[in-house]
A protein has these predicted regions:
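Intrinsic-disorder/low-complexity detector
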Residues: 1-82
Length: 82
C-alpha cells in the first residue's frame, strides 16, 4: 500500500505515463521500461527487468527505461517540480 505522501506522486507518474507512453506504438517491453523510468524520475520504487540480461526484451525494456526516466525528469524540471 502506498503512503499518503506517495499517492499524489504516484498519480502524477501514472498520468505522465498515460499521456506520453501508453498509446505509442512501442513494444510492451519498451513500455514496461518507460513506466519504470518514469517512476524513478518521480522518486518512486520501480520494477526491475523480468527478462534475462542480454535478451531483445531486456534491451527494449532498458531503452524504454532510459526514455521514461530522462523525459519525465525533463518534464518535471520544466514544471518546476524538481
Amino acid at each position: 500500500m502506498n503512503s499518503p505522501q506517495e499517492t499524489p506522486t504516484l498519480a502524477c507518474a501514472d498520468a505522465w505515463f498515460a499521456t506520453n507512453v501508453q498509446r505509442c506504438p512501442r513494444s510492451a517491453e519498451w513500455k514496461h521500461g518507460a513506466r519504470a523510468g518514469c517512476f524513478k524520475a518521480h522518486g518512486l520504487a520501480f520494477e526491475r527487468s523480468p527478462w534475462p540480461s542480454g535478451t531483445a526484451q531486456d534491451d527494449a525494456r532498458n531503452a524504454g527505461f532510459q526514455y521514461g526516466y530522462e523525459q519525465a525528469k525533463h518534464d518535471l524540471k520544466a514544471e518546476g517540480a524538481l
